[in-house]
């Protein structure tokens, strides 16, 4: 799915991490990708961990991603903190939210609370109106967009 070639992109990413953050010892562990051309890695260091996102600049609008993340944070929506980025190269360093999944926490005692909280956040996202760079509009999630997204499963 991704347009990134790991051997081509990981070397510049490692250089960016070393030069930007004075890292000498670290490991990049691949994380499960989402349904986009982005790739995620856990950056494991002696001092802890962060998440690194690779976003092909020709496929992903990183400026919009940053604007939406900032707006979500202002609205109190819990998202990873953006620690650093290089838009031209498609690199982003994010805080690490860990591995906890709702699926692992769901049981008869937690189901009502977890789903109530999830629906509350979905509502917050729906009413959020982020300001994108250059006043560009958010993509509409209409039938055409849904068909495009579903077509990704065929790839």
What are these regions (language model features)?
Residues 2-26:
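Juxta-kinase regulatory segment immediately upstream of eukaryotic protein kinase catalytic domains
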Residues 155:
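Conserved P-loop NTPase mechanochemical-coupling segment
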Residues 23-41:
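ATP-binding glycine-rich phosphate-binding loop
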Residues 1-3, 138-139:
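Charged, low-complexity surface segments at secondary-structure and domain boundaries
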Residues 5-6, 29-32, 142-144:
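Alpha-helical interaction segments
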Residues 41-148, 152:
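ATP-binding pocket architecture of kinase catalytic cores
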Residues 6, 36, 58-61:
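Alpha-helix N-cap/loop-to-helix initiation residues
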């Amino acid at each position: 799915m991704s347009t990134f070639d790991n051997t081509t992109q990981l070397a510049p990413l490692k250089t960016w991490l070393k030069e930007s953050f004075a890292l000498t010892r670290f490991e990049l562990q691949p994380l499960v990708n989402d349904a986009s051309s982005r790739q995620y890695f856990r950056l494991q260091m002696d001092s802890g961990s962060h998440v690194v996102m690779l976003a092909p600049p020709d496929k992903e609008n990183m400026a919009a991603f940053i604007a939406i993340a900032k707006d979500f944070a202002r609205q109190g929506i819990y998202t990873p903190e953006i620690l650093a980025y290089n838009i031209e190269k498609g690199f982003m360093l994010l805080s690490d939210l860990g591995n906890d999944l709702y699926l692992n926490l769901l049981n008869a005692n937690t189901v009502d609370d977890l789903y109530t909280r999830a629906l509350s956040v979905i509502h917050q996202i729906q009413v959020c109106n982020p300001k994108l760079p250059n006043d560009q509009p958010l993509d509409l999630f209409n039938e055409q967009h849904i068909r495009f997204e579903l077509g990704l499963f065929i790839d």
